[in-house]
Design a protein with these regions (language model features):
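N-terminal Rossmann-like NAD(P)+-binding subdomain of aldehyde/semialdehyde dehydrogenases
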Residues: 1-97
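Rossmann-like NAD(P) dinucleotide-binding subdomain of oxidoreductase/dehydrogenase enzymes
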Residues: 88-151
């Protein structure tokens, strides 16, 4: 685990500041993956839980995650805009302008729980992929009790 984390830290330092189109592409690929496996995901979760109603999984896991991703995509452009601030003296006397430009740093870890593993993994993952202040490098650690879902 420590070795993987160290490799991810090195990789995060090499990452460029992700553009809007790169972030949207990552979110679109996540949506495509979810749509491609939308029948297998409820089956895997049902097998992990012994029995879990398909509609529960579709609403609580898939639909909630879809909504999160669509909300992020809708607002991402405005979230990425630099925030204007007042320049401090003496710089403001010379017409200086100040902005805050959020940039990703570091590595994010997501440890997913057993009860709603898909939504509580991919919901935060979508936020991380689009986020302004955290890294596009993520280490996901799923709960051991959902081994079929992880496959």
């Amino acid at each position: 685990m420590q070795n993987t984390l160290e490799k991810q830290k090195i990789q995060s330092r090499r990452q460029i500041y992700p553009s809007l189109s790169m972030r949207i592409d990552r979110l679109d690929r996540m949506l495509d993956m979810m749509l491609e496996y939308q029948t297998q995901i409820p089956e895997a979760l049902s097998e992990d839980f012994g029995h879990r109603p398909e509609m529960l999984t579709k609403f609580a896991e898939l639909a909630a995650t879809f909504d999160s991703i669509h909300f992020i995509k809708k607002n991402l452009k405005s979230w990425m805009k630099p925030e204007r601030r007042k320049a401090t003296p003496p710089f403001n006397l010379f017409g200086a302008k100040a902005y805050i430009q959020y940039q990703p740093v570091g590595v994010v870890g997501i440890i997913s729980p057993w009860n709603y593993p898909f939504n509580l993994t991919f919901g935060p993952l979508a936020v991380v992929l689009a986020a302004l202040t955290i890294s596009p490098v993520v280490v996901v650690i799923p709960d051991e009790s959902i081994c079929v879902t992880c496959d």
